Swiss-Prot record:
N6-carboxylysine carried by residues: K219
Record lineage: Bacteria, Bacillati, Cyanobacteriota, Cyanophyceae, Acaryochloridales
Organism: Thermosynechococcus vestitus (strain NIES-2133 / IAM M-273 / BP-1)
Organism superkingdom: Bacteria
Protein known as: Urease subunit alpha
Record keyword NAD present: no
Amino acid sequence: MSYRIDRQTYAETYGPTVGDRLRLADTDLIIEIEHDYTHYGDEVKFGGGKVIRDGMGQSPIANAEGAVDVVITNAVILDWWGVVKADVGIKDGKIYKIGKAGNPYTQEGVDIIIGPGTEAIAGEGMILTAGGIDAHIHFICPQQIATAIAAGITTMIGGGTGPATGTNATTCTPGPWNIYRMLQAADAFPVNLGFLGKGNSSQPQGLIEQVQAGVVGLKLHEDWGSTPNAIDTCLSVAEDYDIQVAIHTDTLNESGFVEDTIAAFKNRTIHAYHTEGAGGGHAPDIIKLCGQANVLPSSTNPTRPYTVNTLDEHLDMLMVCHHLDPSIPEDVAFAESRIRRETIAAEDILHDLGAFSIISSDSQAMGRVGESIIRTWQTAHKMKVQRGHLRDPQRPGVDHDNFRARRYVAKYTINPAITHGIAEYVGSVEVGKIADLCLWKPAFFGVKPELVIKGGVIAYAQMGDANASIPTPQPVHMQPMFASYGGCRTTTSVTFMSQAGIANNIPEQLGLQKTVLPVGHIRQLRKADLKLNDYLPHIEVDPETYEVRADGELLTCEPATVLPLAQRYFLF
């Protein structure tokens, strides 16, 4: 005889189901579960008197015979492809199945087998997302990595050698010797890492040797001279080796204007960093790049979202990061040319329209490495408050925020993965990918993950006093777990490398301990390949007023005076 349970009790026991809604932290964003892969009456849950016991929800099947290593039960998955409720099975460090977990001898429809070798993670009432990808890292200090993973970032791509003056300003690891040292250092960290070489050269040989040394891409930066010739040379090398090029264009327009830079691209794929321009780039109209089909445009988080404090803090940040002198008028003028309220306001709206595709940090170089996810959801919230409901083109009648949430989560997960040729391995909650996952309490969504799972093992978690009798006594804060230590660290994280570097046996020559995976399928990319963020507007910028128009429509919004995901979450 079946037993009926009211919706509230069901949600409290097994987590929300189809039709239930969750608020994302203290934002105004509301998501609704669209599908439930678990079976009513046959749900699995761990605990005393619960379902995952031998002969009930746990089978006698060994791992070698098909049982998974880890099961996450009854989680709400939020990813670019949808909002669903499911169990998630992890096997050999990868996502094995998204569906219904349990014991096939006692339950129907089981596609994730729980056995005596299966660990359980309770996902009831929790939100599961892919680990974040930050594709604009200045590797200024190793302490950034702990801050990033504690915030939910599991993959970091960028350049640098430490707090060198060049690294403070540019995301480049220049030359084979420096590249080798950073690749060796990567073994020490529980995140996936990939390094960008210096792309500024009018001749190819100095770029080719960096690609063959193992970088995942090349970075063109104006502080090294982003001239049309350097751009053309760098992209030509990238075409030969199937790697990405990231660019920070010429703010001062010394070697040409934005139209000259676009011409130098020759319709070849490129990742445009901080495409609005406050982080650097042709003043005042670098934002036009987001209308180019071959340009994969990103933002960095200090301008996310536009607030009453944004302009003031940017000037001081810029002076420090780019080695400028406040006593030199030309340096001050350079800084002021980059900070424009009109283009920053337009950037908010272009993100909401899906014209800007990626959000990253610009860590310690005008950006905060632990705030990319926070700033993404603050932008989504601000846009809902100011622009209202975002219509889902596939389901125009719904009144929840699933489409907006999917668009924004894609900006720091699948889209940077696609852009840098690693989407085969990471960037989404999909079968076959590395199990880099974040589990969030809805009240803390986007701010403080409850667990960060790296390659199927918990790497960071909210943990209380280690001397307490239970895990929860205060002070509770994010702490490294076992995937952050010893050999587990090198088996649950990877280093990304160019195909040329792997062919040159760089991993063996350097004695790298991490698995090394090749980047690829990059040079044919277009903005249309980026998920839910592929809008190509025609952008016009008034050179006198800096007003921005997209397809003829003026883009402007007010700065926020208060934001969610902010001080109330960091009182302790």
